[in-house]
Amino acid sequence: MNILFIMFDQLRFDYLSCQGHPHLHTPNIDNIAEKGVRFSRAYVQSPTCGSSRMSTYTGRYPSSHGVQFNAYPLRVGELTMGDHLRKAGMGCHLIGKTHMVADAEGMQRLGLAPDSMIGVRQSECGFDPFVRDDGLVAEGPAGRYDPKPSPYNEALKEKGYAGDNPWHDFANSGIDGDDVASGWFMVNSDKPANIK
C-alpha cells in the first residue's frame, strides 16, 4: 500500500480546477483528486503554515505540540505521522519544505548527533528526507545524509543542463543568472519555468 499525502503552501481551496475554479487549470492534481481521498472540509489549526503542518503531523493542537511559529522546533520525542507509519512497516519520506528545524537544544541535552538517523528524522518531522525543496538530496549539518545523487538534477543533466545543481541554476531561477526566484517570493512566478 502507498500513501501520497500532498500538503500545499499558500494555496486557497478554490484555486484548483477540481474545486471549480473557472480559469486555473490543474489537470494533474485533478487526476489525483479523482482517484484519491479529498479532504474537502479540512481546517488548519494555525494561521502559520509551519505550526499547522506540525498539527497535521502530530494530530495535536499547537498549544499541545508547542510549535507556534515557522522554523520553531518540534520537541525531541514528539511522535509524528512518519513515526507511526514507519512502525507499521512503511517507508516514510518527505519531499519539499516544512519550515521545520531540529530541536538542537533537546538533541544536545540527550546526546543525539544532528547528522545521525534520529537527528535527521527529528529535523524532518519524523520522516526520512528524500529531496529537499531546492532539488538537492537532503544533507545533514555535517554532510550528506543520502549518498545517491539528486534525481531532479540527474534528469536535468540527462537533458543537457550543466552544473552541480541544474535545478537551482535553471528550473528554480530567473532568466538571468543573478535573479534567483525562490519560494513564494518568486518574481517570475507568473512565467513558465526556464526548462526546455
Model-derived features with residue positions:
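Formylglycine-dependent sulfatase
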Residues: 1-196
